Amino acid sequence: MWDASQYEKFRGERTRPFFDLLSRIPDRSYQVIVDLGCGTGDLTDALAEHWPEARVIGVDHSEEMLKSAAERADPGRLDFVKDDIAAWKPAQPVDLIVANASFQWVADHESLLGRMAAALGPKGVLAVQMPANFESPSHVLLKETVAGKVPLRHDIVLPVGRYVAILQGLGLHVDAWETVYQHVLQGKDAVLEWVKGTALRPVLEALAGAEREEFLAAYATRLRAAYPETPSGTLFAFRRIFFVATRR
């Protein structure tokens, strides 16, 4: 289960990529905007503020997240619905689809992008941001520490060049780039607290009691060695992939 309060820690660092993505979306009028993996809805709300004339729909499969998002709803202008991205299909063509840090949870990106392209209306736009730090120490140490206890999903995020090729093959114009953010996180065991909000969630759901506490202690020790805390905080490099694809 998603923990909205845990995810909201380091809010500034987590939301910055969204606004970097937003800055590259063609600034024109959109009638229907869909935010896939809307979470607590705060960034969906930002889309509604940026394009006040549009109907904005946030989609998420987590009841916990949607419970928080519902407080922001403005029926007919800003709505939230429960659905799984892997099965989502709009009732009508969409002008702008935004997927901020959500596609990494969905398998088979080639098929996924085909469905997204099919959902776009004329001159429609697909804007995506995904973490691509699965070879970073935080993830490598997670795999090593949990080995044999909990099966972990394989990294399904593709090289950025592969996304360009797939999207161009679908007839879309593509603007793609990568960014490595150098976050300086504050607080004790900051990287552990960060990962608890995302990649660590399935592991914590699978373990319980003493086994869970033993895992957390071992993982925290390894993270402290890989990411030493300094008087200024803990430096945490985080690579992300972005692309904005437009129907010609």
Which stretches of residues belong to each language-model region?
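Conserved class I S-adenosyl-L-methionine
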Residues: 1-34, 42-46, 65-68, 125-150
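A short acidic, Gly/Pro-enriched loop at the edge of an enzyme's catalytic core
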Residues: 89-97
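Short catalytic micro-motifs in class I SAM-dependent methyltransferases
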Residues: 101-102
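Class I SAM-dependent methyltransferase SAM/SAH-binding core
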Residues: 32-88
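Conserved Class I S-adenosyl-L-methionine
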Residues: 40-42, 156-248
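A short glycine-rich, Lys/Arg-flanked "PGG" loop and its adjoining helix->strand segment in the class I
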Residues: 110-125
